[in-house]
Amino acid sequence: MTNSNSITPVMQQYVTLKQQYKEYLLFYRLGDFYELFFDDAIKTSKILNIVLTKKGNVPMCGVPFHSSETYLNKLVKLGYKIAICEQLETSEEARKRGYKSLVKRDVVRIVTPGTIVEDSLLEAKESNYLACIVRIKDSCAIAWLELSTGLFCYHMTHISKLDSDLLRIGPKELLVADDLLEIEAVYSIIKKYRFSITQYSSSFFDENRAYNTLCNVYGVSTLKGLGDLKGVEISVCGSLLEYVIATQKGSLPKLGFPKAYVQSDFMFIDAAALRNLELFSTQSGELEGSLIASIDFTVTASGGRLLKRCLSAPLASADAINRRLSAVEFFVNNQNLYKSVRQVLRGIADIERILTRVKIARCSPKDLYSLKLTLEKTYELVELLCKFNIDIISEFCSRLGRYEDLICILNNSLLQNSVSSVKDGGFINPECDAQLSEYIYIQECSNQLIQELRDRYRNITNIQSLKILYNNILGYYVEVSSNHLIDDKNFIHRQSLANNVRYTTTELKELESKIISAKDASISLEIKIFGQLCSDVIKYADKITITAHAIAEIDMLTSFAELAVQYSYSKPIIDDSYEFNIKKGKHPVVERNGKFITNDINLSSEQRVHLITGPNMAGKSTFLRQNALIGILAHIGSFVPAEYAHIGVIDKVFSRVGASDNIVCGYSTFMVEMIETAAVINQATERSFVILDEIGRGTGTYDGLSIAWSVIEQIHNVNKSRAIFATHYHELSKLDKYLKHIKCFCMKVEEWDGKVVFLHEIIPGASDKSYGIHVAKLAGFPQSVVNRAEYLMDKLKTNEDLLT
């Protein structure tokens, strides 16, 4: 930056503020633009591809205030943090303090990836979490908050499970202590997922400091009556809130006390399974082709977010799962009803996020109007649902609530064409306030009032060419030609030109004052009325939150019904047994590509481990993933892609299917494989579901076979989990001779006329061929290479010397 003694007062004000917010891009409000200067300008102009200019030696660029959210969106998505500096008064107000007084400006909030609430900056069906981690020995406390909805949770976890927890939560921004990043295991996870990181010294996470923050936020002197927070949990929740308060400059919505995420209530899906099963994105990072893209039929933003939360943490209670399944079954059996419900839901706004914007005084008239329309829509939902005397449906009706008084207030006060900003007015119904009606009348009738005054002056002066005109210098004025001078003391001379003379009158000045001030006064009054409307909405906040959650749940359940009807899914039997019996199961994503071969599986207590052999390309990996996905779908309360499914509650899902070199962490393919397998054998229980594909393939034959053999023994004898193990080691098929609960299966293959046909069908028994050369041929190997491979294979079978 330049010498502060040689810059203008405005730039001095900027420099002073920038010193306080060095780590942020400073959006400095100047009139209708946000301006950036010095290094901020150079960096931002490149990122946003906007013009970089100079004023003297100062680099600068700017974005229009009215379209600033578009630019903020791009910066936030790239992980930048922006300090928003606004004008706190008008230039007229500043001049009242002195002719050369500078307009007061200050930073009113800090926009970071994890603290945004504006619809234009948020993905409708994506949660936008800010998370915080505090470590104690080998454990971590995690807290996560979605400011746009108020969802606030915390959880204790072991460092070994941090990868899975962070992948499940998916925070947009992560708040950590500097020394936490010095732990290699933590640093590698954070670097791998490229979270936006905000670092503080360890003192920021002090427990006493956090305790005081929590007490201040919730207005209590002790936390004893609010929950079971203790020790490091206090640190993580309080520190997260302190950061939010700092970014919002104290404008914090009323938040519920943080809720403990109890792992035993939910299925644990480890990080490898979340990735390998492609629940939320494919291996290449695309949404298309993922499980959620295939099953998401939700029509509201909140329903979409709920579905994603449920998929990342499926239920682990048979009663809770069956409650959802019963609701889905009800809708499947009443298709006209659920289709009508979904039609109503399509017209419903994201009132969960609207309510937060109301609470922090950052909502628009359009938000309130959308809220009103949605509350009206809830009556339509109740009317559709209340005809059915079923417990879960009756519960939905009670949660949807009634809002006659609030709807009446909003209806009487808001115009239908409510705008997105309060600054220009024009959104409050003039009929709701007599003073506002007068201001609007003056504005709307200003031309008529001026014309009436002009006609009267023409009659008084007998000058029919007399005009009343307006410019920015004189305001309104009377103009006549130089040939028609006015000899009347009520007409005060203002200006003489070559051909015209201009006058004013006391009456004209008063009318001008009314016209000009009426606009400002009406906007001020509209803003005041709008503030009262927001206060009225906040009185219903708790009730609206309950309604919003009910809407999301109804949307998700009717979405499951639509999925079941469209693709002929069946209702699974869920209980506390150890069954996993699927008949004619299908992969919920792959089946959409066309003809799909169904398969059965029965992982009963008598044969809880299935060993599958067969060639690559025969469908082993698809079969493994398919059954894990069927289990997960059942646990979120969805029907499943199978003719029949009986599944005992699963507590954890582990997947070791496919691997790629984890270059970011410096791990080889084989190391990744071993780490993921270690997670399985260290954490799986008899209620877990495990799929393992080609364990040991990344090392020598004997090493790999030995590792695979011992892993199967461990899962069979110690973990006792339900497991499917696919392998190319045909020697492992001997294990069913001495391991009591293993059964061998293989992929059915037919050979005909020298050709191999993969039937993608699972049959009992073991495969004695891998058909690797045939797969190479299908992949496009030159015939000469294929022939040579066949020749060498024949030699190997007879133990001949390959070099002779």
UniProtKB/Swiss-Prot annotation:
It comes from the Bacteria. One of its GO terms (biological process) is mismatch repair. GO terms for molecular function: ATP binding; ATP-dependent DNA damage sensor activity; damaged DNA binding; mismatched DNA binding. Gene3D superfamilies: 1.10.1420.10, DNA repair protein MutS, domain I, MutS, connector domain, P-loop containing nucleotide triphosphate hydrolases. SUPFAM superfamilies: DNA repair protein MutS, domain I (SSF55271), DNA repair protein MutS, domain II (SSF53150), DNA repair protein MutS, domain III (SSF48334), P-loop containing nucleoside triphosphate hydrolases (SSF52540). ATP binds at residues 614-621. Pfam families: MutS_I, MutS_II, MutS_III, MutS_IV, MutS_V. Keywords: ATP-binding, DNA damage, DNA repair, DNA-binding, Nucleotide-binding. This protein is involved in the repair of mismatches in DNA. It is possible that it carries out the mismatch recognition step. This protein has a weak ATPase activity. Belongs to the DNA mismatch repair MutS family. This is DNA mismatch repair protein MutS. It comes from Ehrlichia ruminantium (strain Gardel). The lineage of its organism: Bacteria, Pseudomonadati, Pseudomonadota, Alphaproteobacteria, Rickettsiales.
